[in-house]
Amino acid sequence: MARIALTRDKIVQATIELAGKIGLSNVSFPRLAEYFGIKAPSLYNHFKNMEEVRVATAVHLQKELNYELTHAMVGLTPLAALRAYAESYKRFAEKYEAVYELINVIHQTNNGELEYLAKENIRLVRRSLENFHLSEEENFHISRMFRSTLHGFITLTQLGYFRQSGSISKEESFTYMVDHLLSRLDNPENI
């Protein structure tokens, strides 16, 4: 049998794939070793433990999320950029549903790179909000509200809420929610 050229990135990619099949909480060194057809101790050449794998996966996901958000927002008006952020964030969360929780482990790790990437994500929203001539405090609050609302909707969806209820789909509710949040920016008196 040929020796596999194992890398940290391959382990991260396998973690994402396995999480989609067996659930993130079931991904372990033995499961990863089985995936690669190797013995589990070989993984210790790349990571000390599963917590390091989870953090590396979180960094990978946050980088990809920031890339997708930035490219979705570039060249748009501030309002359109925020809408693109919301839609791109939701698509990302749906694509990576099995590992979505990892982009929210920033304060549980002590990882400077992950913290920096999370702040970059926040800056994308705050920079767009600067165009609405808000006070620093309003920018801060609206940024938190916007990101919290998106995360809440995604989390509740992943928990099984928002299933088809009559003739209203979760996509319609998401669009309504984003429209309502952004409409307040169009009329500063509502803020």
Where are these regions (language model features)?
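The alpha-helix within a helix-turn-helix
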Residues: 33
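Residues within helix-turn-helix
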Residues: 30, 41
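Amphipathic C-terminal alpha-helical segment
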Residues: 95, 102, 148-167, 180-191
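Hydrophobic alpha-helical connector segments
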Residues: 70-98, 110, 134-136, 142-146
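Amphipathic alpha-helical packing segments from all-alpha helical-bundle domains
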Residues: 70, 108-136, 140-145, 156, ...
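An amphipathic alpha-helix adjacent to DNA-recognition modules
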Residues: 5-16, 20, 25-26, 37, ...
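N-terminal intrinsically disordered/low-complexity leader segments
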Residues: 1-6, 189-191
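Hydrophobic/aromatic residues within well-ordered alpha-helical segments
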Residues: 57, 61, 65, 85, ...
